[in-house]
Amino acid sequence: MPMTAQRSMTHGIRSSGLAVVGILAATPARAQPTPIFDGAPPASWIAPPGVPGDSFTVFHTRKTFELGKVPARFVVHVSADNRYRLFVNGAQVSSGPQRSDVTHWRYETVDLAPQLHPGRNVIAALVWNWGAARPVAQHSHRTGFLLQGNSSAEAALVNSGYGWRVLVDSAYAPIVITSAAMGNYYAAVPGDSIDGARYPWGWEQPDYDDSAWYIVAPPTQTSAAAPLAAFDNAAGGGIVGLAKRRAMQPGDYGEVTGWQLEPRSIPPMEETLQRLARVRRATGVTTDGAFLRAAGDLVVPAHTTATLLLDQSHTTNAYPVLETSGGASSTVRLTYAEALVDSAGRKAHRDSIGGRSVRGVRDVFRPDGGAHHRFQTVYWRSFRYVQMEIVTADEPLRVHDLHGIYTAYPFSERARFASDLPWLADMWRMNWNGARIGAFETYMDTPYWEQLQYVGDTRIQGLISLYVSGDDRLLRQAIEHFDLSRIPEGLTASRYPSAVTQIIPPFSLIYVAMVHDYYMHRGDSAFVRERLAGVRGILDWYARHVDSTGMLGPMPHWNYVDWTNPWPRGVPPGADHGHSATISLLYAYALQRAAELEAGVGMRGAAEAYRTRRASVLAAVRSRAWDAKRGLFRDSPDTVSYSQQTNVLAILTDAAPVAEQRALMERVLSDTTLTRASYYFGFYVLEALRKAGLADRYIEQLAPWQGMLRLGLTSTPENPEPTRSDTHAWAAHPNYGLLATVLGVRPASAGFRTVLIAPSLGPLRRAEGRVPHPRGDIDVKLEADGERGLRAEITLPAGVTGVLEWRGQRRALRSGRQVVRL
């Protein structure tokens, strides 16, 4: 690589004519930076020379150091832009950083001691920036890597900066995936093209010879032994310390530049071996699929084109790993799909392959002829099917192995549900798979198409997580990110992190409900208090849009409520031009929850103000949108249209009087002329079903999920057929409903301090399950006793009490196990 003068990494300041590995100070710029960890000097950000900070870049960096003996702990903090994988003596120890934005950039804390040994040790990192091809969810300041020792002992040996070695890896190129090419909106990662002839095989191993790599060195060292000059930290630009946001220091002027680092708030992602199930078809080569089990090689002769269709048997997220020998100048193309399609792009039963092909995201690997070379993409792929196309040149290619490394947020499945209706168990597995692969460092609407964390999706995903896993950390992450996304008007972004701002005002109302969900299931008044400024800003924005009718007037932005055919872009009548009963009711829904939040933290005046505002909105909707002749609420008083969405919101907000809600819900279910709710808004339909006293009909409303199973789906789709995405966790909400409605386990007070168990068995004669609770597990075993009786065996965690409700009867519940007959 030529050594030429270049622009430095630090905020437009130029180097003094020297080629540099760019270094950015880890503290605000001044001549004598203050240590940030236990006396440790600050590390520096490093990046390759001659590469614009916003361009596609993959680089490797290494640091060799000696230890007389291995300490009990050797703690470092590590980050990168866009992402990194960190190795110690050849073993991977960390990856990240956790996704966020530049002003809340994350770092991981890792104890390297288990991988160290006396003598020579090597830390190595793979770092990449997708550049212009980066996914919409990916924020970026510029390419860089940072490793900071926790104390002066670690810092002296391994702080990134002077003495590290760096190599740009020219083997990588992005395969840009466009929405136009995909035939639908695509916002996720590009594919990888990896040329084995250019790849520095073994770069992460301690015995690799890195002597030809660039050295990060002080600017005064310009000899051949140290061909790269470090950027002088005192010259300008920097970031706050790793441990916490730094207080102002003498000479500071409050300027914020570059990455503002904060610790990782969630655990490392799960990574486990996952083998493809089978070869469904093959042309150009014969195989029994042994290579998928690493039990025998697939040998593709020279000058051969072979195509294999591989089936995982279920949708998944995984890093594809290919191990080959020989085959110089050959090409292996992997194309990933959730389902196969016909020539018109239509899906059928997900097991069906006849007359169908794979279209989608792809990677290309080019073996160089070496032995046992292992290709792995920098990021994971989402798929059920993988099409493997191999074209060989003058040498045969030997494929030893092709497998995946499954990855997802490490949710454990603590909850369980069993009943005398067997297909519910199949649905549970489908839903939970969709929920798992819809969660990584954030929740994701779809892991294949977008990988974006949307408010509407996330509220449902968060409830599933709480009820099935009991882990609230990813939900806290989401609430914090949506709070950070707020624009000056007061609204949250519809999705965050996102490098492209999108505003869906109704999602801001759903955000209020999400904060309330957390309040009811976890309490944590300090966390809730921190969110209240955002909640108030949202509701104040809506208050400014209430017109003289008492309903919401015209509203800007994208007023999406639900994907349903009669509504263009999912926007209900009246949303854009005024008087949407649907969104006015959603506003009232949020006001009620905000009132409870304010009351819960002692803000009684604010709570009463929200109740008053809610009552005013509901009165306006009743007087203007109620159609007494139809016995339904119109979507807007200015149109003659009716929907499930509007009428279930009328039930959930008590716009419909309590005494009339059951009859209204019956009409919602039976009137086929109504605009129907999608899988997403079906969550609110089923919540209204319970509130209207019809929860015994919950199971019968799950017919669409039976249909999913009949189609061979292994995760829940975005919409009914034809659906873009086969994995959309917003449709996995019946796992929540089985626990919260059928078993009937819900908080009776904030923080889940007390429990309400109100079962609704419907057609079931037996149901049992477990719901994780902050203090332990709630176990419920129910058996129908005759036509109207119930035998309930219930165990509550220590310190938790509650109430059992059944057909108008109530029984107090204590901690521990108890048997109740009603």
PLM features: residue spans?
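Alpha-helical support elements that line or immediately flank enzyme active sites
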Residues: 319-338, 386-391, 455-485, 515-525, ...
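Extracellular/oxidizing-compartment recognition motifs
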Residues: 32-445, 457, 473-474, 493-497, ...
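Bacterial N-terminal signal peptides
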Residues: 15-25
